[in-house]
Regions:
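Active-/binding-site microenvironments in catalytic and ligand-binding cores
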Residues: 1-241
């Protein structure tokens, strides 16, 4: 959902989605509504929002370093619009594969992971074993932390205070594991898909470059996974197409 009067979970610094009527009965009441033959009248609205203000794929050209985005393209190709590495191919063809839900919050006995709480590939495999499933090559990896669901259960000021999300944390071993497993897509119920600031290096969001820019792994962010996780737990079925 977007433009919720109570607010939506967005990255700090991005404005909330805004919806407004540009035509409704009020315009007709004050004589400003357009008239058509017969008794036809109408209401219309418009929305203003960040394209990363709801559930979405990060384009592979979303981040870069050393003046190069994914596949060696120049960062200059992002000027004005993404001439390379946009989400257009995903929009045209989609992505289909075996999905596997790893419920890290449930595995750790929590409703939601703590702010800044981390996990790595070994933790993912341990959680999978506890669920009785195996992460296979080329799986679409869906990871629940409970973080987005918690937004709707507490005051937004509390959610954003000292903002640091839980999530995957960088290591060379983790990046090698993702490469060896040929994971095409990571989906999480967080805004940025990884811990906000790496606790070892102090670098912000290092996996965005390590996984997207270097390996071409797509990231899906701000997914509401609580209903899916509850259904999977009830059925003890954690994989799906």
């Amino acid at each position: 959902r977007m433009a919720d009067p109570a607010g939506d979970p967005v990255w700090p610094g991005r404005s909330q989605s805004k919806r407004m009527n540009i035509m409704d009965r009020g315009h007709y009441n004050c004589g400003k509504g357009p008239h058509f033959p017969g008794s036809y009248e109408f209401a219309d609205d418009v929305m203003f929002f960040h394209l990363q203000g709801s559930t979405q794929y990060d384009a592979l050209g979303h981040v870069w370093y050393d003046d190069q985005i994914w596949n060696g393209y120049s960062a200059d190709t992002t000027i004005g619009s993404l001439a390379k590495a946009s989400v257009a191919p995903l929009g045209e063809k989609g992505m289909v594969g075996r999905g596997i839900l790893i419920d890290m919050a449930r595995h750790r006995g929590k409703e939601v992971l703590d702010a800044g709480e981390t996990f790595n590939h070994e933790d993912l495999m341990a959680a999978a074993r506890a669920q009785g499933v195996t992460i296979n090559k080329r799986d679409i990896l869906i990871i629940r932390t409970g973080w987005i669901g918690s937004f709707y259960k507490r005051d937004p000021e509390e959610f954003y205070k000292d903002f640091i999300e839980p999530g995957l944390t960088y290591s060379p071993e983790l990046v090698s594991w993702f490469q060896e497993m040929e994971i095409p897509n990571i989906v999480t119920d967080t805004i940025a898909n990884e811990v906000t600031v790496d606790p070892v290096s102090g670098v912000a969001l290092p996996l965005h470059n390590a996984l997207m820019r270097n390996l071409g792994i797509t990231l899906t962010e701000i997914a509401q996974l609580d209903p899916l996780a509850d259904d999977c737990a009830a059925d003890q079925q954690w994989t799906f197409l």
